[in-house]
Amino acid sequence: CQVVERGLDAXAX
């Protein structure tokens, strides 16, 4: 997963 602008993991999603 990649880091999103939220600062979280994209897979966490």
From Swiss-Prot:
Top-level taxon of origin: Eukaryota
An example Gene Ontology molecular-function term: toxin activity
Chain coiled-coil ranges: none
Taxonomy of the source species: Eukaryota, Metazoa, Ecdysozoa, Arthropoda, Myriapoda
Localization, UniProt: Secreted
Organism: Scolopendra viridicornis nigra (Brazilian giant centipede)
Keyword Disulfide bond: yes
Entry's transmembrane regions: none
Misc. remarks from the entry: Shows similarity with the venom allergen 5 from wasps. This similarity may explain why patients with allergies to centipede venom also display allergic reaction to wasp, honey bee and/or yellow jacket venom.
GO CC aspect terms: extracellular region
Sequence similarity: Belongs to the CRISP family. Venom allergen 5-like subfamily.
Organ and tissue specificity: Expressed by the venom gland.
Protein name in UniProt: Scolopendra 20385.85 Da toxin
UniProt KW keywords: Disulfide bond, Neurotoxin, Secreted, Toxin
PTM annotation: Contains 3 disulfide bonds.
